[in-house]
């Protein structure tokens, strides 16, 4: 029990009220509160997250659940985003031919991956999509859904940090890559 208390104290230091975090597939969230709630016969502490781009939504993350808390990541800085964009042209991961293995691996990246892995995932699926388009085919619906989810997570964070609209993220990225290529 004492170890749990230590963990709670340690985790509580990690995030405080009004911190902005990236939380799994919910995207950019503000830590609205750290509260206690009765759950069965015990009181538990929760981070209360408000997704920035999902009006009216609330997410409760138990402070003691280190797996869920691990999905709460500090948002990137402007400098981090520029570095990710600069490295973007070289970022891909291996295309996995087995549909089930690919789905599992790519969903794992969505759940727990770094931003670099998200960029690699987006670029890999995009390149496969373009390759198939040339021969009159399309990617599987599952791959398309994973692609859209990865874009949503990454582009919402970029938009929030850069203080631009989500629709402006892709043009911003292309512009930054263009500038880098010219220099």
Question: Where do the PLM segments sit?
Answer:
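Conserved hydrophobic positions within beta-strands
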Residues: 29-31
């Amino acid at each position: 029990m004492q170890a749990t208390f230590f963990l709670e104290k340690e985790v509580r230091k990690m995030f405080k009220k009004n911190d902005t975090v990236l939380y799994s597939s919910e995207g950019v969230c503000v830590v609205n509160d750290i509260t206690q709630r009765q759950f069965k016969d015990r009181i538990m502490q929760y981070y209360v997250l408000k997704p920035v781009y999902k009006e009216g939504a609330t997410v409760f993350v138990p402070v003691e659940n280190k797996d869920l808390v691990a999905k709460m990541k500090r948002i990137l800085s402007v400098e981090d985003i520029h570095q990710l964009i600069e490295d973007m042209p070289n970022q891909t991961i291996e295309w996995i031919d087995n549909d089930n293995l690919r789905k599992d691996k790519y969903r794992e990246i969505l759940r727990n991956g770094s931003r670099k892995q998200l960029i690699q995932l987006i670029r890999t699926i995009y390149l496969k999509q373009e390759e198939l388009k040339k021969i009159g085919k399309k990617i599987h619906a599952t791959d398309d859904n994973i692609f859209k989810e990865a874009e949503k997570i990454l582009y919402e964070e970029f938009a929030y940090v850069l203080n631009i609209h989500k629709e402006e993220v892709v043009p911003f990225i292309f512009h930054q890559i263009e500038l880098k290529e010219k220099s």
